[in-house]
Amino acid sequence: MRDIEKFIRGFSRFQEQYLKEPTALDSLRQGQHPRTLVIGCCDARVDPALLTGCDPGDIFVVRNIANLVPPCAPDAPPGVSSAIEFAVCGLEVARIIVLGHTMLGLMQLSPRHSRRNP
C-alpha cells in the first residue's frame, strides 16, 4: 500500500507544481511538439525524463526491453516501429537518442549467461 500512497503524493506534488503557474500546461493543451525521440530501456532505474531533467512535452519516449529496435517487417508486431514512425513523420522530431545503460537485466537472462551460470 505504501507504493500507492507514494504515487498519490507524487502526483499531488506534480499538480501543485504545474497548476501554481497558470501557463505551465497551456502549450501541452495544444498537443505535443517534442523535438527529440528517446528510445530507452523499460528498466525502472532508467527514466529518460528524470535523467535529462525534461519537463512534460520535451521528449517523446519509447521504452522497451534493452532499447531494442526490431526490423520493420509485415508480420512483426508494430509497437516500436509505429512509435518511431509517429515521432519522425507525425511529430517531426529533429533528433533520435538511444539511451543505453549498464547492468542490463536482459543480459542476465541471455542463453549464453544461463549456460555459464546454471
Locate predicted features.
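Short, conserved "active-site rim" segments that organize catalytic pockets and cofactor/ligand binding
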Residues: 1-78
